[in-house]
Amino acid sequence: MEDYGDRVKFFMSEERKQWHNPETILKNVGVVKGMTMADLGSGPGFFTIPMAKATGEKGLVYAVDTNVSMLNALKENIAMSGVDSRIIEIINSDVSHTGIPKGSVDIVLFANVLHEVEDRQAFFQEVRRISKPTAYIIDVDWKKIKTEHGPPLKERLSEDEAKQVLLENGFSVIKQTDAGPYHYELICKPTCI
């Protein structure tokens, strides 16, 4: 079994926060207390924990990941963060089959995930299924530039490629921003298809 200790430390590091700050990314969609959010591909909680802090004790955050080691690290990080663990529901599942109730989520976030999704049609069907009609969808991913960290350049999607994938799967991009030196953020809404 692979040791994820160093990866978890890096995923939760201040260095990474300088690349793309979760609080800033969430402010771009106006998170309010009591919202229900989903972090698809949550890993050890880099976005999950700030999402829980933003939505507060009356909110709910679903943290979905297939990697049990990452989810165990998430549990540890939640305990250390002081966030009420009752507002975070951890789901060990593929991001295309989450089990999250239909039409229940105000904000769906997937960070550094889209370039890895093999069955994008199934993934976006699930995103649409769990989203409220008024939901915001946030895609944060690696810019298609050469960097020291991150996936190989050939696996990355440019902003235009990601926008096209989103559009083809029923989501319109309403805002595009830099999410730091290595990442972009696309804020979307479900469209009628």
Predicted regions and their residues:
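Class I SAM-dependent methyltransferase Rossmann-like catalytic core
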Residues: 2-19
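Conserved alpha-helix/loop element of class I SAM-dependent methyltransferases that forms part
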Residues: 17-36
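Class I SAM-dependent methyltransferase SAM/SAH-binding core
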Residues: 38, 44-97
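A short acidic, Gly/Pro-enriched loop at the edge of an enzyme's catalytic core
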Residues: 96-107
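A short SAM/SAH-binding and catalytic strip from SAM-dependent methyltransferases
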Residues: 106-119
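A short glycine-rich, Lys/Arg-flanked "PGG" loop and its adjoining helix->strand segment in the class I
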Residues: 121-136
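Conserved class I S-adenosyl-L-methionine
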Residues: 138-161
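Core SAM-dependent methyltransferase catalytic element
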Residues: 175-193
